Amino acid sequence: MIEKTYCQDIKPELDGKRVKLAGWVYSNMRVGKKIFLWIRDSTGIIQTVIAKNVVGEDVFETAKKLGRESSVIVEGIVKADERAPGGAEVHVEKLKVIQAVSEFPIPENPEQASPELLLDYRHLHIRSPKVSAIMRVKETLIMAAREWLLREGWHEVFPPILVTGAVEGGATLFKLKYFDKVAYLSQSAQLYLEAAIFGLEKVWSLTPSFRAEKSRTRRHLTEFWHLELEAAWMDLWDIMKVEEELVSYMVQRTLELRKKEIEMFRDDLTTLKNTEPPFPRISYDEAIEILQSKGVKIEWGDDMGADEERVLTQEFDRPFFVYGYPKHIKAFYMKEDPNDPRKVLAADMLAPEGYGEIIGGSEREDNYDKLVQRIKEEGMDPKDYEWYLDLRKYGSVPHSGFGLGVERLVAWVLKLDHIRWATLFPRTPARIYP
């Protein structure tokens, strides 16, 4: 391993010290007999100065031709200079070129490129400081979730990705051949988490989920990261409390640790700071009334899509819940409302500022006969869910759970214009490369 000093550690206090930097050329500018070479590594960008009378003619000419993303190692002396970014720069004495790049396919300002070009060259685009910032924020949100879940006594489990049945509807399954059988890519770990609660009571997982939806909206991916929780002995109101406490902690902790990165995308942090529980709660009935009062053409019983949710979120300055959805627009495993058989005990958490649903949750149907009936109503075969139905035959208990779309949360926190920027290599109906 090359011993090096990271860019973030080059500070005025190191004035006069010799350092070695290893990284990539971010920008190259010649001014007379000096070259200002900005070098990027995983921690930031530092200005280096290459003077012809120090490094000699040959090295100077080599440096002059270095294009963006050329990989280099430089050695030199730190000089405190208030004009330099960060108050210090490195005056180069030695330059080693690992690989020279003449022309990088992505413009210096990626925002000048089309989304399609950035996605075609996503393997190169992810080097940019903004993409790195997105990934750091995503990483920190997940780290914060782990902290909270560990503190609150939840157990992480590791469910399968290859499954035999649908959780969210058969039309969105990715089908594949599994030796002499048929298998599918998991839409959700939920059914397996439900099995785990009978031993561990409070469980969670973080896995990729797959949906063969041809939706081309700004909030849909065919592959996304799914943070899912399931707990025995909890009803809908209990699990909603878990959701708001978890999301609040994730956002506040990430604000604490990644404020600089978040400010690259948001000028105003007020909305993110305003995530202390409890979150507002409105019924589906109230949501329909609000939308109708805003001129939206929607009737009771209709599902709310991205457009309707966007209008609804304008009424709130923080995440909020919509609960009590009609049974026919929700999944088979959700428990029927005992006070209104038209509805299920389900709630979605919506993010403000037009982002909409980030969590879907419900109390689960714990009665064997009712669950069989719901499976049949959805046109599915109970035999395909025999193992899942066993959970209702051997010590069934009230339980609830939810799933959080990680990329949707990242998109809201960073105010991204499309969910595809919240994942390393996005998968959509139109894109599986690179």
Swiss-Prot record:
Any Pfam family hit: tRNA_anti-codon
Enzyme class of the recorded protein, top EC level: ligase
Subcellular location: Cytoplasm
Its EC number(s): 6.1.1.22
Alphabetical list of SUPFAM superfamilies matching this protein: Class II aaRS and biotin synthetases (SSF55681), Nucleic acid-binding proteins (SSF50249)
Predominant location: cytoplasm
Gene3D superfamilies assigned: Bira Bifunctional Protein, Domain 2, Nucleic acid-binding proteins
Keyword Disulfide bond: no
GO biological processes: asparaginyl-tRNA aminoacylation
Gene Ontology annotations for the cellular component aspect, listed alphabetically: cytoplasm
Record keywords: Aminoacyl-tRNA synthetase, ATP-binding, Cytoplasm, Ligase, Nucleotide-binding, Protein biosynthesis
GO terms for MF: asparagine-tRNA ligase activity; ATP binding; nucleic acid binding
Catalysed reactions, as listed in the record: tRNA(Asn) + L-asparagine + ATP = L-asparaginyl-tRNA(Asn) + AMP + diphosphate + H(+)
HAMAP family: Asn_tRNA_synth (MF_00534)
UniProt family annotation: Belongs to the class-II aminoacyl-tRNA synthetase family.
Protein name as it appears in the record: Asparagine--tRNA ligase
Organism taxonomic ancestry: Archaea, Methanobacteriati, Methanobacteriota, Thermococci, Thermococcales
This protein's encoding gene: asnS
